[in-house]
Amino acid sequence: MTSRLVTPQLAEQFKQYPLYSQDGKKKDAICLCVFFIGKVRWYVLEGQPEGNDFTLFSIVVGLADTEYGYASIKEMESISVDVGHNLPKIPILQDKSFKPCPIGNIPDERLQSFLSNMYDREEV
């Protein structure tokens, strides 16, 4: 299943990273892609088709709290922001310049603060 957000290339990548495949990898988990709208980011770690939808597991940054969570591609594709002034609504988009890498290497202060709070305390 492909869609506006899940391209054939991304669907192929997800075959290597189905849900639960990166459990326990912490900061070494590979982030496959990034979706965004405004200052909100979905750092996607895993995904797989489920029926006529796609379920993603990601870290969401930029909402009230940063957290791990599951997201439906169909729901994400239905989200848009109306900025008014007769401008078109802004949908969630994929950061096409992003290259897969360990989540701990991504230069987003909010993300790294979340990861440090989750995992650095475990090592003490």
Segments and roles (model prediction):
Residues 84-124:
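Low-complexity intrinsically disordered segments
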Residues 19-22, 47, 75, 103, ...:
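Short linear sequence elements within intrinsically disordered, low-complexity coil regions
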Residues 1-38, 122-124:
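N-terminal domain-onset segments
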Residues 45-82:
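Acidic, aromatic-enriched beta-alpha/helix-loop junctions
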